[in-house]
């Protein structure tokens, strides 16, 4: 059986890793081993970051809604409960956008939630 040389394959793999390491500092972008280690670590960070981004945005939306509802005399949790009782099904992203760009419409939603809470 003939011996298989992996020169082309290894070269291709090294080029792929070094391309991913573009922009890293020092040996991490020039030499294969440190570049490979840091590329693997950076891919882990990217994976974790994609999960954290969802949490961060939800936190941001809730903070914005809370600030806007408190300006209208209601807490976030009571506001969300009032919307649920009123049968209004809007996600937090849309509510936070309304709180910023459509203050009158958001105030109407808060009033609707207040009425349903008092009823």
UniProtKB/Swiss-Prot annotation:
One of its GO terms (molecular function) is structural constituent of ribosome. InterPro entries: Ribosomal_bL20, RIBOSOMAL_L20_CS, Ribosomal_protein_bL20_C. PANTHER family: 39S RIBOSOMAL PROTEIN L20. Keywords: Ribonucleoprotein, Ribosomal protein, RNA-binding, rRNA-binding. Belongs to the bacterial ribosomal protein bL20 family. Binds directly to 23S ribosomal RNA and is necessary for the in vitro assembly process of the 50S ribosomal subunit. It is not involved in the protein synthesizing functions of that subunit. GO terms for biological process: ribosomal large subunit assembly; translation. The keyword Ribosomal protein applies. This is Large ribosomal subunit protein bL20. The gene is rplT. One of its GO terms (cellular component) is ribosome. It comes from the Bacteria. The lineage of its organism: Bacteria, Bacillati, Bacillota, Clostridia, Peptostreptococcales.
